[in-house]
Amino acid sequence: MPITKTIQPKYPIRYKSFSGLIFVIIILLVSPLDACRLWATISLPGYTLFDSDNNLDSTIREELTEFQLQGGCRENSWPYNNHNGWAMVYYSDTAIYESNQLIRSPLPAETDSLSFYQFVSQMLSEDSQSTIGLGHVRKASSGATDIPNPHPFLMTFQGRTYSLAHNGNVDKTVLLNLITDDGSDYEWIDSHPPQTFGHGFWQDDEGWNYVVDSELIFLWIMKNIRDENDDIFRGLLAALSVLEKEHQYGKKNIIFSDGSDIYAYRSTLSTTIDLFYSDGSFVNPELNPPDYHYSVMSTPPQDGLAGQLNWYPIDHRMLAVLSKDGIQEYENFPDHVINSDDGDRKSVV
């Protein structure tokens, strides 16, 4: 019997109709919360994640307290089942130079408190000068399981470190065929072989079993960014438009960053809304001015100061771009047509 949790969504959510609101509440009442959970945040210009003024440090810590609880698995009424490790990374620049900016653990975040909060304290310290953070708590559905959480996947390319965390599942054979152009071009994947975590060559049967589908999604996106002359927006558009045509039923909730911006994409036929962003504003106007950060979470806090932030749902097939200058939504992103407003920018304001 799956564990379920009754949720009374205290964070304000924009709905297009009252019937849509009722439908989503009903789904939330009966849906088990047993998928991977994602978190990311970006500070606004002139601020780092350290800044405690205007409630910034407080709300981020509350987001991460909730996020840690989502990385656990207990008996009885515990609503989460993300016990296959946790990981976080933070940026102080567009490239990640120090190994201490990344942590990966094979343990459930909910029970790995010492390591979790040591890293959080470091990430939010003044010395770190951090401006972007990403996190993932894992319920393994593809590839190796008893390993430190491999999300977010990282690649340093052309002097910039890219990162991706994913919730969902996509057929690995479909992804391999996309990356290799149906087996005719192995140049990209040979240059960036997927990990097998100690189980041999990725093309061998054993090695392939341990490859994680999310890393192949990352490689496919990065190949398209390269092919689009390092234009992230166009690369994401090219990669996701093809992927949605080839594998429209796979769950593809993605957080992607280049160290300058955060790109959050939601794609799932599940009726549960499971990716939200906050623009830093509060429900209660007396708490404004707003926090000087934007965040993305699969399941935002419902209590405390972070629970009083405005949290907006990212709809099916929507891309939300969180930059230091604002947030831009792209509805039905895979069908987006590039226009003059998009230009050749690597990030979208």
PLM region spans:
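Secretory targeting signatures
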Residues: M1-L33
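Extreme N-terminus nucleophile/cap motif
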Residues: S31-L114, L269-T272, Y312-P313, R317-R345
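Surface-exposed intrinsically disordered loops and tails
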Residues: E66-N76, G183-E206, E286-N288, N339-D344
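Conserved catalytic micro-motifs used in adenylation/nucleotidyl-transfer and phosphoryl/amide-
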Residues: M88, P150-V170, L240-P301, G307-L319
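Short acidic (Asp/Glu) patches
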Residues: P106-Q122, V137-G159
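A basic- and aromatic-enriched beta-loop-alpha substructure that forms the phosphate/nucleotide-
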Residues: S121, I132-G135, I225
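Short histidine
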Residues: D171-D258
